Swiss-Prot record:
It comes from Pseudomonas fluorescens (strain SBW25). Forms a cylinder of 14 subunits composed of two heptameric rings stacked back-to-back. Interacts with the co-chaperonin GroES. One of its GO terms (molecular function) is ATP binding. The keyword Nucleotide-binding applies. The keyword Signal does not apply. It catalyses: ATP + H2O + a folded polypeptide = ADP + phosphate + an unfolded polypeptide. This is Chaperonin GroEL. GO terms for cellular component: cytoplasm. Pfam families: Cpn60_TCP1 (PF00118). The lineage of its organism: Bacteria, Pseudomonadati, Pseudomonadota, Gammaproteobacteria, Pseudomonadales.
Length: 548
């Protein structure tokens, strides 16, 4: 085991504080409408230019191991805020830096770190409760566009396109962000449930000009196994032919004799039919088949529940208004499922989203959720160069997270004003002892930090701006983009309550941990030249001279 170096008390905290400040100073340069860019060198290709706090934080690794511990803890603040609300990483970093710096002074002056932390925690709870009181619901398109604009560093085109996407697919719908091919941002919307499986044979195509198979008012057969024997399917095919409606088959696979028979029937016009593979693999495929069943009002034919394909009847089949199948995708529009069943399925998937700890599983569950709740919107980001494209795509994703957070928990006045107004909650708050009161005072000063930084990045005097905002009431604040004081909501400067809350809670949590650290342990740096020596000189290899 490698030897360790241990630092205690003030010398440990001082080193960590240096690391906190290095990381936070790099991140906070990006805060606000006049925040600057940070340029990051890459091991290959062009450098990345970004105004995204978490992207900057992730790149920082310090040489001194004790300083690096402090930096990594603040990086964790940015990541926590990002995981919880998808935005607010820079605000969280600025708050954490302020809490650590203010708290460090108090610890150095002889205050008890544990009582300080309790005071900070008490004040955080009070401010979070006050933020909830200040919060206003965010329901209309205009407010959603404003939130998106602010999060995308005051780019109104991004705010508008996100608001339009939310209007079209609903608050729960899936909105994905992709790299576009032009200079302008584009929005395309797919109605209904789409999954990434195309037709199993091009002979199912009935629209040769677009190479798609389109079925109007089809019946939908869902089978949780491979179909290779046509005899199993004959009863269902005969019933569908009598009903005179098209048929879509979604199964693990259709192959051999079964596929050939379906193609022949389709080409002769006996039964208008198309077959696709079920989406996903393993247990996820079973779950997605069940989703399609709920959406279309059908039953999955599965031997696990005692249903065989031979005994399937028209009652087991789902239906939809229209199905469009291309080479790679299938879209089911307006399924005939019962609304109550669909809502129950959505509630069940939401519970699974809340329980899962895997990011990949969460993403897949949210995709299923959106497919059930109607519609997928794709925002294609346009830009003039690849470097700009990456930077812009990151901003669009941030803005999308912020708008979702705003819809979920409402909005508060932006620009650091909500935190200043929430200070009223601390007016009569007292701790159990003098040191806890100092902890409350630490947070009281720290929550001014985002507004101070926004003002500083705009070239204004932070103390003057903070005093002016404190003397105002309600939504009165400072628009750093124009240098004007006024009603923040009317000026369209809004922050999602969830983003502000998550930023404060993450910052207070990590800030308290750093202040209560009494010992820090790191690997001892290896002495130069301590590695293994080179291989000894092996001399020439004899007997090789005659070889050319």
């Amino acid at each position: 085991m490698a030897a360790k170096e241990v630092k205690f008390g003030d010398s440990a905290r001082k080193k960590m504080l240096t690391g906190v400040n290095v990381l936070a100073d790099a991140v906070k340069a990006t805060l606000g409408p006049k925040g600057r860019n940070v340029i990051i060198e890459k091991s290959f290709g062009a450098p990345t230019i970004t105004k995204d706090g978490v992207s900057v934080a992730k790149e920082i690794e310090l040489e001194d191991r004790f300083e690096n511990m402090g930096a990594q803890l603040v990086k964790d603040v940015a990541s926590r805020a990002n995981d919880d609300a998808g935005d607010g990483t820079t605000t969280a970093t600025v708050l954490a830096q302020a809490i650590v710096n203010e708290g460090y002074k108090a610890v150095a002056a002889g205050m008890n770190p544990m009582d300080l932390k309790r005071g900070i925690d008490k004040a955080t709870i009070a401010i979070v409760a006050e933020l909830k009181n200040l919060s206003k619901p965010c329901a209309d398109t205009k407010a959603i566009a404003q939130v998106g604009t602010i999060s995308a560093n005051s780019d109104s085109s991004i705010g508008d396109i996100i608001a339009e996407a939310m209007e079209k697919v609903g608050k729960e719908g899936v909105i994905t962000v992709e790299e576009g091919t032009g200079l302008e941002n584009e929005l395309s919307v797919v109605e209904g449930m789409q999954f990434d499986r195309g037709y199993l044979s091009p002979y199912f195509v009935n629209k040769p000009e677009t190479m798609v198979a389109e079925l109007d008012s089809p019946l939908i057969l869902l089978v949780d196994k491979k179909i290779s024997n046509i005899r199993e399917m004959l009863p269902v095919l005969e019933a569908v032919a009598k009903a005179g409606r098209p048929l879509l088959i979604v199964s693990e696979d259709v192959e051999g004799e079964a596929l050939a028979t379906l193609v022949v029937n389709n080409m002769r016009g006996i039964v208008k039919v198309a077959a696709v593979k079920a989406p996903g693999f393993g247990d996820r495929r079973k779950a997605m088949l069940q989703d399609i069943a709920v959406l279309t009002g059908g039953t999955v034919i599965s031997e696990e529940i005692g249903l065989s394909l031979e005994s399937a009847t028209l009652e087991n089949l789902g239906s939809a208004k229209r199905v469009t199948i291309s080479k790679e995708n299938t879209i089911i529009v307006d399924g005939a499922g019962v609304e109550q069943d669909i809502q129950a399925r959505i509630t069940q998937i939401r519970a699974q989203v809340a329980e899962t700890s895997s990011d990949y599983d969460r993403e897949k569950l949210q995709e299923r959720l959106a497919k059930l709740s109607g519609g997928v919107a794709v925002i294609k980001v346009g830009a003039g160069s690849e470097v700009e494209m990456k930077e812009k795509k990151a901003r669009v994703e941030d803005a999308l997270h912020a708008t979702r957070a705003a819809v979920e928990e409402g909005v508060v006045p932006g620009g650091g004003v909500a935190l200043i107004r929430a200070l009223e909650a601390l007016t009569n708050l007292t701790g159990d002892n003098a040191d806890q009161n100092v902890g409350i005072a630490v947070l009281r000063r720290a929550v001014e930090a985002p507004l101070r930084q926004i003002a500083a990045n705009s070239g204004d005097e932070p103390s003057v701006v903070v005093n002016e905002v404190k003397n105002g009431k309600g939504n009165y604040g400072y628009n750093a983009a124009t240098g004007v004081y006024g009603d923040m909501i009317e000026m369209g400067i809004l922050d999602p309550t969830k983003v502000t809350r998550s930023a404060l809670q993450a910052a207070a949590s990590i800030g308290g941990l750093i202040l209560t650290t009494e010992a820090a342990i790191a690997d001892k740096p290896k002495a130069e030249g301590a590695g293994g020596g080179g291989m000894p000189d092996m001399g020439g290899m004899g007997g090789m001279g005659g070889m050319m």
